[in-house]
Amino acid sequence: MSMKNPPHPGLSVRYDCLEPLGITVTQGAKILGVTRQALNNLVNCKAAISPEMAIRLDKAFGGGADTWLRLQAAYDLAQAEKYAGKIKVRRVA
């Protein structure tokens, strides 16, 4: 089952990981070993989850690094599909 418009995975970090535990962005950044700006950009949908961040999120909150990356991939693909009609490619096979 695919979602037509999956949310940015940074929202999952904010609403499923940080807020339920009462963790601020500053505290979360320290837990994850990243800068406050990096985590702030992620939870405000301005940055993507990298493979390294996926590992950090898994170590801190669980869920599996692969799951975090799948959330990001689903979001990225949905964004790209919005513009698929503008992509001009000649089919060769």
Whereabouts are the PLM-identified features?
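Short, basic-rich loop-to-helix N-cap that marks the start of a DNA-contacting helix
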Residues: 46-59
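Short alpha-helical DNA-recognition segment
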Residues: 22-41
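A short, Lys/Arg-rich alpha-helix, primarily the initiator
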Residues: 1-23, 70
